[in-house]
Curated annotation (Swiss-Prot):
Source species: Aromatoleum aromaticum (strain DSM 19018 / LMG 30748 / EbN1) (Azoarcus sp. (strain EbN1))
EC number: 2.6.99.2
Gene: pdxJ
Active-site residue numbers: 43, 70, 198
Pfam families assigned to the protein according to its UniProt record, in alphabetical order: PdxJ
Marked site (Transition state stabilizer) residue numbers: 151
Function text: Catalyzes the complicated ring closure reaction between the two acyclic compounds 1-deoxy-D-xylulose-5-phosphate (DXP) and 3-amino-2-oxopropyl phosphate (1-amino-acetone-3-phosphate or AAP) to form pyridoxine 5'-phosphate (PNP) and inorganic phosphate.
Protein name: Pyridoxine 5'-phosphate synthase
Length: 251
C-alpha cells in the first residue's frame, strides 16, 4: 500500500516567526499520525531556520510512526542522526540562500564521501535515503554508495503541472511523469525503494501516486497550508485518500 510521510517543517516555521513555543511540531506529528500519516519527516537544517535540535529529540521520543530525518551530509548532522537513530535519514543538498531545497543531491560528484556517510549511518542501524533528480546516472550512483532508498525530486513535474493549468495530459507534464517513472523503474531494478516528493499538492499528487513502482510520498507545505482551514488531521486524511484512490487501495 502506498504510504504518506508528512513533513512538518512549516509548523516549526510558524513557531520560529515569533520565536515562541507554539505551534508544537511534536503535537503536529501526533495529529498527522491520527490523520493517517505513515511517517513524519523533518529537515534539521544547518542554519536551524525552522526545526530545532530539541524538536528532533522530542519527535524521536514521542512519534509512534517512522521518523525520517532530512539532513545535509555533514559530520555534525551524521553525529546527530547516529545519536538519535531515526528510522531513516535522507541526504539532501542544502544552501543557506535557498527558501527550500531546490534540486536533487549530486551523488555522482561526491560518491566517495557519501559512501562513508551511508556506512556510518548503517552502522547505527539507520536506513539511508538520497533525494535525487530523475536521472539514471544519479540512481546508479545512489546504488553504488549503498543507499537503500531513493526519493525522486518531483519539483520539475509540479512546476510543469502548474504551468500547464493543471492539465495532466499536457506534453510537458507527460514528459516529466515519464522521467519520474523511468527513474523509479531503475531504482527498483537496482534493489532500492522508490519514494518521491517535493512540491506535491492536492491537485498534482495523483499522477505520481499512480506510478506502479512508487512506495511512499513525502508531502509537507501543501498539507500544512490546508490544515490552516481544515485542521491537520483532516488535511492528512484527504491527502491519503487521494493517494490511495490513485494507487488502488490494495497497493
Amino acid at each position: 500500500m502506498i504510504e504518506l510521510g508528512v513533513n512538518i517543517d512549516h509548523v516549526a516555521t510558524l513557531r520560529q516567526a515569533r520565536r515562541t513555543w507554539e505551534p508544537d511540531p511534536a503535537w503536529a506529528a501526533m495529529e498527522a499520525h491520527l490523520g493517517g500519516a505513515d511517517g513524519i519527516t523533518v529537515h534539521l537544517r544547518e542554519d536551524r531556520r525552522h526545526i530545532q535540535d530539541e524538536d528532533v529529540r522530542r519527535l524521536r521520543e514521542l512519534t509512534q510512526v517512522k521518523l525520517n530525518l532530512e539532513m545535509a551530509a555533514t559530520d555534525e548532522m551524521v553525529g546527530i542522526a547516529c545519536a538519535l537513530r531515526p528510522e531513516m535519514a535522507m541526504l539532501v543538498p542544502e544552501g543557506r540562500h535557498e527558501v527550500t531545497t531546490e534540486g536533487g543531491l549530486d551523488v555522482l560528484a561526491q560518491e566517495g564521501r557519501l559512501k562513508d556517510v551511508v556506512a556510518r549511518l548503517a552502522d547505527a542501524g539507520i536506513v539511508t535515503s538520497v533525494f535525487i533528480d530523475a536521472e539514471l546516472g544519479q540512481v546508479e550512483a545512489a546504488a553504488r554508495i549503498g543507499a537503500r532508498v531513493c526519493e525522486i525530486h518531483t519539483g520539475p513535474y509540479a512546476h510543469a503541472f502548474h504551468a500547464a493549468g493543471r492539465d495532466p495530459q499536457s506534453a510537458a507534464v507527460v514528459d516529466e511523469i515519464d522521467k519520474v517513472r523511468r527513474a523509479g523503474e531503475a531504482i527498483r531494478a537496482l534493489g532500492m525503494r522508490f519514494n518521491a516528493g517535493h512540491a506535491l499538492n492536492y491537485y498534482n499528487v495523483q499522477p505520481i501516486a499512480r506510478l506502479p513502482e512508487v512506495r511512499e510520498l513525502h508531502i509537507g507545505h501543501a498539507i500544512v497550508s490546508r490544515s490552516v482551514f481544515t485542521g491537520l488531521r483532516d488535511a492528512v486524511r484527504e491527502m491519503k485518500r487521494l493517494m490511495r484512490e490513485a494507487a488502488g487501495v490494495g497497493r
